[in-house]
Amino acid sequence: MVEDILAPGLRVVFCGINPGLSSAGTGFPFAHPANRFWKVIYQAGFTDHQLKPQEAQHLLDYRCGVTKLVDRPTVQANEISKQELHAGGRKLIEKIEDYQPQALAILGKQAYEQGFSQRGAQWGKQTLSIGSTQIWVLPNPSGLSRVSLEKLVEAYRELDQALVVRGR
C-alpha cells in the first residue's frame, strides 16, 4: 500500500493516477526506475536536490505532498475504470478540502477529465478550483509517457513559479 503524504499548509499536492506495481511493492510513490517524477520536481524547482522514492516523506520539508486518484495498483493506468476514477475524484475533493493546499496538480489530462467529469482539459491551471486550491493539470511523468523530460520540467516549473508569484 502506498500511503498519502499530506499535511495542512502545503504549496502543492501532486496527484498520480494510481500506484504502479513497483510502488505497490516498495510502498513508495513513483518508485519505478523509469518514472521521472523525482527528477522532474527537482529540475522544476520544487526540491533543492533529487529525492529518491524512499525519501518521499521529505517532500513535506518542501511543503509538497503526494496522493492518488485510485488506490488499486496496476501495470498500466489504462487498467483503471472510469467508475474508479470518478469515485477517486470524489474522495480526492474531500482530501483537498481537509488539507487545503495552495495547488493540486493532477498528473494527466485523462485522470483530470474522468476524475472530475470535465472535458477538453488543457495543460496548466484550470478554471475549476476546490475552495481556494488551484487545480493544475500536468503531464504524467511515467516512463510510459511520450512527453519529453524537457517538456515535463517546463510544465512543472510553470506551476512552481506561479506559486512563488502568489507568495507561497
Swiss-Prot record:
GO terms for cellular component: cytoplasm. The keyword Ribosomal protein does not apply. Disulfide bonds: none annotated. One of its GO terms (biological process) is base-excision repair, AP site formation. It is found in: Cytoplasm. Its main location: cytoplasm. It catalyses: Specifically hydrolyzes mismatched double-stranded DNA and polynucleotides, releasing free uracil. Pfam families: UDG (PF03167). GO terms for molecular function: DNA binding; pyrimidine-specific mismatch base pair DNA N-glycosylase activity; uracil DNA N-glycosylase activity. Its EC number is 3.2.2.28. Keywords: Cytoplasm, DNA damage, DNA excision, DNA repair, DNA-binding, Hydrolase. Binds DNA as a monomer. Excises ethenocytosine and uracil, which can arise by alkylation or deamination of cytosine, respectively, from the corresponding mispairs with guanine in ds-DNA. It is capable of hydrolyzing the carbon-nitrogen bond between the sugar-phosphate backbone of the DNA and the mispaired base. The complementary strand guanine functions in substrate recognition. Required for DNA damage lesion repair in stationary-phase cells. NCBIfam families: PRK10201.1. Belongs to the uracil-DNA glycosylase (UDG) superfamily. TDG/mug family. This is G/U mismatch-specific DNA glycosylase. The gene is mug.
